[in-house]
Amino acid sequence: ATFSEAPPGNIKSGEKIFKTKCAQCHTVEKGAGHKQGPNLNGLFGRQSGTTAGYSYSAANKNKAVTWGEDTLYEYLLNPKKYIPGTKMVFPGLKKPQERADLIAYLKBSTZ
């Protein structure tokens, strides 16, 4: 399934998902530091493995995917399948609604 087939995302629900499943390793605010994972500010339109000051796995750099709704929707289903060798230990979000909500929140909070 692709992002175009996903249900509409809810920013507030996405924020809750981010706080419970992502915020222990990621920040979204401009100028916020990296944690276990990179700061996600400016994520949309950026190539994987290119955030300044973060040490990525070779897998993330070599994937060279441009992050957007479609690529994030697929990645967040199963990160280790999408980028074998990624350092991200998160197992993914199986529910299309949760992925759509998280993407809506990320789009709103990282631009």
UniProtKB/Swiss-Prot annotation:
Modified residues (N-acetylalanine): 1
Residues annotated with N6,N6,N6-trimethyllysine modification: 80, 94
Alphabetized GO MF terms: electron transfer activity; heme binding; metal ion binding
Subcellular location: Mitochondrion intermembrane space
PTM field: Binds 1 heme c group covalently per subunit.
Residues that hold heme c according to the record: 22, 25-26, 88
A GO CC term attached to the entry: mitochondrial intermembrane space
SUPFAM superfamilies listed in its UniProt record: Cytochrome c
Coiled coil: none
Stated family: Belongs to the cytochrome c family.
The protein, known as: Cytochrome c
Organism: Fagopyrum esculentum (Common buckwheat)
